């Protein structure tokens, strides 16, 4: 009995070591398919958990397995997994310094006029290790769902509204969700919406029509309609129409920039784009490798053709085409490991904005993949949240 118990124990430890190495490997290995992308997104964000698991696995290997080739293999796997899982934490101090410098370079001494009452509501540190384990409390807010703002082609489009606990007149955030223009709904990233509402914003999470039934510019038309509706009904929903910012993720970031940058755009005070595409012809010509989402197929579905067959439409659908002077201040938050929207295009956009005299801040997170903030308490979102709320306070103050 003791022999078989030992065999079972050793087998379980070997499996634990192998599983931990498999999970930890996605911190550095790009996901080749959409089915594996959640591992590439999540592994860096929960890496402190993986550090703990890998440390335990290493100890169990030493304690439970005799000196055999299997033990050395299991120990090597556990130690390699431990090394991989600790990489984001090792990068954290330098990353915090780089992000703080990027904020100062873009905004100057932005915290000088930050009211102490507002600062107390914000995160006090860019990164708190304990929050990875215990989570981040979004705080209290009022929630109203299903506010219909438009019915294009008879399709009702609605928004969800998050407001601070007390009635008032607040700066407004328009939240546009991700989903490659083909999926998603306003309930995505609800923790972020609740968090910002609890800290003094009226937050409108809006819907838009999807491909393949509706192609560009239908999605942009829907964002315009939402923006016009919010301007018209601002008092009813406790929003200050003079202090509106648009926050978008991925496809939503793309739409946010277009809605803010177009020459005839309704006025907004700031734009925040989390990993949003900016150059559609460039992205089509130079897709990432590997390309888990099949970039060209997504763009062809969204646009209704290729850049060769409809170059003007691709140009009009690219935020980089609208760069000129006097655009709203823009914050880009992007992962260096983003394998859907490549960082190099965002860097080009950032430099173009600066060259034309605009305010632009680019926060690059070295270990982060696309959609990193899907893990709300993860390493990357803690950094993003800390700086995003300060950028928005600066822009909407």
Regions found by a protein language model. Give the residues of each.
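Catalytic nucleophile-loop/oxyanion-hole region of alpha/beta-hydrolase
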Residues: 45-46, 184-193, 204-243, 262, ...
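Short beta-strand/loop motif that positions the catalytic acidic residue
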Residues: 326, 332-334, 338
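Short beta-strand element of the alpha/beta-hydrolase
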Residues: 169-179
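Catalytic active-site module of serine/aspartate enzymes centered on a nucleophile-bearing elbow/loop
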Residues: 379-397
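Primarily recognizes the serine-hydrolase "nucleophile elbow" in alpha/beta-hydrolase
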Residues: 26-30, 225-288
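N-terminal cap/lid segment of alpha/beta-hydrolase-fold proteins
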Residues: 23-54, 58, 114-167
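Conserved alpha/beta-hydrolase "acid-adjacent" motif
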Residues: 339-348
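Hydrolase active-site cap/lid region
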Residues: 106, 110-125, 257-312
């Amino acid at each position: 009995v003791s022999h078989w118990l030992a065999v079972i124990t050793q087998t379980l430890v070997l499996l634990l070591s192998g599983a931990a190495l498999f999970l930890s490997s996605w911190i550095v290995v790009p996901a080749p398919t959409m089915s594996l992308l959640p591992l590439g997104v999540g592994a860096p964000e929960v890496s402190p958990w993986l550090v703990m698991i890998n440390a335990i696995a290493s100890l169990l290997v030493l304690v439970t397995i005799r000196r055999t080739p299997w033990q050395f293999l299991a120990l090597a796997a556990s130690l390699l997994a431990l090394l991989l899982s600790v990489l984001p934490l090792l990068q954290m101090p330098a990353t915090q310094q780089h992000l703080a410098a990027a904020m100062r370079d873009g905004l100057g001494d932005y915290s000088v006029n930050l009211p102490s009452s507002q600062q107390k509501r914000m995160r006090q540190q860019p990164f708190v290790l304990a929050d990875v384990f215990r989570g981040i409390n979004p705080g209290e807010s009022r929630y109203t769902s299903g506010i219909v703002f438009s019915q294009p082609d008879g399709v009702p489009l609605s928004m969800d509204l998050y407001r601070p606990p007390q009635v008032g007149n607040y700066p407004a955030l328009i939240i546009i969700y991700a989903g490659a223009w083909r999926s998603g709904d306003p309930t995505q990233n609800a923790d972020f919406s609740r968090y910002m509402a609890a800290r003094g914003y009226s937050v409108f999470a809006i819907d838009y029509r999807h491909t393949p039934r509706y192609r560009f510019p239908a999605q942009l038309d829907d964002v315009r309609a939402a923006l016009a509706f919010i301007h018209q009904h601002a008092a009813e929903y406790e929003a200050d129409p003079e202090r509106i910012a648009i926050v978008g993720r991925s496809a939503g970031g793309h739409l946010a920039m277009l809605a803010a940058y177009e020459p005839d755009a309704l006025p907004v005070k700031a734009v925040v784009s989390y990993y949003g595409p900016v150059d559609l012809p460039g992205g089509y010509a130079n897709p990432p490798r590997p390309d888990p989402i099949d970039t060209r197929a997504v763009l062809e579905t969204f646009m209704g053709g290729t850049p060769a067959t409809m170059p003007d439409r691709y140009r009009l659908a690219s935020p980089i085409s609208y760069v000129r002077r006097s655009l709203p201040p823009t914050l880009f938050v992007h992962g260096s490991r983003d394998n859907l929207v490549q960082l190099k295009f965002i860097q080009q956009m950032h430099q173009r904005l600066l060259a034309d005299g605009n305010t632009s801040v680019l926060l690059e997170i070295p270990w982060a993949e696309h959609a990193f903030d899907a893990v709300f308490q993860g390493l990357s979102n803690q950094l993003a949240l800390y700086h995003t709320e300060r950028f928005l306070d600066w822009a909407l103050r």
